[in-house]
């Protein structure tokens, strides 16, 4: 095993965003989030977003954890979404990951994340021509094709350094008990942990600001509550922030049933 390659799947997943002009007839650049397992080179997630926002990661990461399990660490850069200069503080994303026992490891340079950087080049070299030939110009349709291409990359394309497909390397590690992956938990807080949370106080009118409206909450004026903005765009209001020792007390949601 090479020194710089993790021996077990789930030890370290490299995560990065790559802004690029993906659509050949558009001058706009969009970020693509990519994540791969350091041991097997399996793509655990690849998706385009309008912008690189906290909500983008709150959409991207739980989907990967549900599909593949929870790794021990994510290898990231010093973007403010991941890093705070206060050593005793966590970003909202860092806090969400810690809630599910996942830590962050910071790459000192872009070159230190060479594996995921090379995979950016793979997508940049392939997708614009593919989207042109398939006449794809909408992000939702593009992401459906990216899912299929990621599956093909994992299962069918032999990795030059591993001399086998990433999926075969992943399966081989599992067979040899070289895995530290944990299942995504059945947790009542799951949807709220992966949301942008804002502390609020109920106003003197018994209402709180939710989106462009002020809506009534069944709590006395002055009560502290937590507003959650979910990746889907809907809102929830909780009586308290996520706490593994408690159950969520949902005061409001506009999520369609």
Can you say where each PLM-predicted feature lies in the sequence?
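Mobile-element integrase/transposase regions
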Residues: 1-43, 54-63, 67-70, 98-99, ...
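Acidic/histidine-rich, metal-coordinating catalytic segments
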Residues: 61, 65-86, 107-110
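A generic structural motif
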Residues: 49-50, 221
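Charged alpha-helix within mobile-element recombinases
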Residues: 93-184, 231
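C-terminal, beta-rich DNA-binding module of retroviral/retroelements integrases
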Residues: 150-257
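Charged helix-capping and loop-helix junction motifs
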Residues: 87-92
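Short small-residue beta-strand/loop micro-motif enriched in glycine and branched aliphatics
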Residues: 41-46, 105
